[in-house]
């Protein structure tokens, strides 16, 4: 059980930021704010969400993309991070698992995820 002051602080943090609803298998485009000296810029990272873990303020999600020379790049982001400028859901994937770590072993077309049709 958490201290009530900690709980009040966490509740206030959760109210400040809204996130789109997404799950593992969805393709996301994340805008990450990067500060270099006095300048700030937004760098975009696009990939598949392969895991969501935790809850409340401590909730995180992992996004995987295939970079240059077919090298996989995974980044873990806190849900309520100040560095996340924007989160956009590009595609809704149809998967039957909560954690898609098996995509690490797949290459090419085997790593594709079916899209939900409406």
From Swiss-Prot:
Keywords: Ribonucleoprotein, Ribosomal protein. It comes from the Bacteria. One of its GO terms (molecular function) is structural constituent of ribosome. Transmembrane segments: none annotated. GO terms for cellular component: cytosolic large ribosomal subunit. The keyword Ribosomal protein applies. One of its GO terms (biological process) is translation. HAMAP family: Ribosomal_bL19. This protein is located at the 30S-50S ribosomal subunit interface and may play a role in the structure and function of the aminoacyl-tRNA binding site. Belongs to the bacterial ribosomal protein bL19 family. This is Large ribosomal subunit protein bL19. It comes from Helicobacter pylori (strain P12). The gene is rplS.
